[in-house]
Amino acid sequence: MLEQMGKQAKDAAFILAQLTTAEKNCALSIIAEQLEQQAPLILAENAKDIELAKQNGLSDALIDRLLLTQERLQGIANDVRHVISLADPVGKIIDGGTLDSGLKIERVRTPLGVIGTIYEARPNVTIDVASLCLKTGNAVILRGGKETQFSNKILIEVVQNALEQAGLPKFAVQAITDPNRELVMQLLKLDRYVDMIIPRGGAGLHELCKQHSTIPVIVGGVGVCHIFVEKSADQNKAVFVIDNAKTQRPSTCNTLETLLVQHSIAEEFLPKLVSHLSAKNVKYHAKSTALNILKQAGANVCEVTEKELRKEWGSLDLNVVVVEDIHAAIEHIRQYGTQHSESILTSSQNLARQFINQVDAAAVYVNASTRFTDGGQFGLGAEVAVSTQKLHARGPMGLEALTSYKWVCEGEYTVRK
């Protein structure tokens, strides 16, 4: 089954690589239109997944990731249209010149080929990845979690029908619909056809891919994100940033998980934060100084464990740690962070610069919420993933991250001396 799927994807990628930007944009436009026109059917299938998720006792955070609404579906269609508006990187000349030999060389962006994406309860990823791959001339094999079986099946049907309407091979976008986990292992070994694996999910999925794949894997997505409130921060504005970073959409990987507060302002600042978040049902996890202050402020708080400081909650749980200064904050991030997104709230330009220079993360913020680490927010279009590794791509992966390059060399029957 996967051998055939891989061959079909490879053949489709050969065709996609030759398409003009206009031809690719036409297909994307039809996909966006079909998402809107088929919205009632898509939402009905998604409702089946939601009902099964509830019956199986899945967490609220997981159900939120799984849920499609009319608003979210429209947002997905809009993201596809935004991808249309973006410059096509394929064929772009990165650099080049003429050598002493007279040989003219250029480094030109090309599609990667076939992308394999393994993800969990995120039906939006189906369209995000498909649209970015199509724009960059890549074929894709998708494997969503069993929680999204109904949603993914209808979304793939919509995309494949749109591709056929555009005169393109429907096998450019394929999905493994069988929930058998052994098929994931087979996909990870399909290096004859697949050029890159992108996992979208928790730490367990990323570890599985790293350990078993014979194909290059993009590592990332797990976000234990921190915000450090330095003593010179505007406290009244800081509570709004923390509110946004923690409560806007707790299930995302760019959500705040651990708040670091400088010791000298902790007794003043933390009660303000508790008051501000009083209606948001935030549960705090803290120790020593922070635990005592939060208890006195009437917060719903318990003692934090070492394991929880490394945990991506994906919920309204928030770790709070009081640190002595910026050095202690940076050291905490070095020890517990996942190199995803880290932020400092401060009025000091010098300390902001120190934080930027010393914190090793895909995205580093000054006086802003970590929630901006997103392809759409960064102007990249719908992202395919957030990479926390350092080779090939880092941070939100947009179009250019789905390309490679080739050296194009032109001569006049030139020979090497």
Curated annotation (Swiss-Prot):
- Please give the pathway this protein is involved in: Amino-acid biosynthesis; L-proline biosynthesis; L-glutamate 5-semialdehyde from L-glutamate: step 2/2
Query: What's one Pfam family here?
Result: Aldedh
Check the record and name the Gene3D superfamilies matching this protein.
Aldehyde Dehydrogenase, Chain A, domain 1, Aldehyde Dehydrogenase, Chain A, domain 2
What stretches pass through the bilayer?
Answer: none
The terms under GO molecular function for this entry are: glutamate-5-semialdehyde dehydrogenase activity; NADP binding
What keywords sit in the KW lines?
Amino-acid biosynthesis, Cytoplasm, NADP, Oxidoreductase, Proline biosynthesis
Keyword Cytoplasm found: yes
A GO BP entry: L-proline biosynthetic process
Looking up InterPro entries in the UniProt record yields: Ald_DH/histidinol_DH, Ald_DH_C, Ald_DH_N, Aldehyde_DH_dom, G-glutamylP_reductase_CS, Glu-5-SA_DH, GPR_dom
Top enzyme class, one word, equals oxidoreductase
Q: What is its EC number?
A: 1.2.1.41
Q: Which reaction does it catalyse?
A: L-glutamate 5-semialdehyde + phosphate + NADP(+) = L-glutamyl 5-phosphate + NADPH + H(+)
Check the record and name the SUPFAM superfamilies matching this protein. Answer: ALDH-like
Query: Is NADP among this UniProt entry's keywords?
Result: yes
UniProt GO cellular component terms: cytoplasm
What the protein does comes down to: Catalyzes the NADPH-dependent reduction of L-glutamate 5-phosphate into L-glutamate 5-semialdehyde and phosphate. The product spontaneously undergoes cyclization to form 1-pyrroline-5-carboxylate.
Which PANTHER family does this one have? DELTA-1-PYRROLINE-5-CARBOXYLATE SYNTHASE, GLUTAMATE SEMIALDEHYDE DEHYDROGENASE
Name the chain's protein: Gamma-glutamyl phosphate reductase
Q: What organism does this protein naturally occur in?
A: Haemophilus influenzae (strain PittGG)
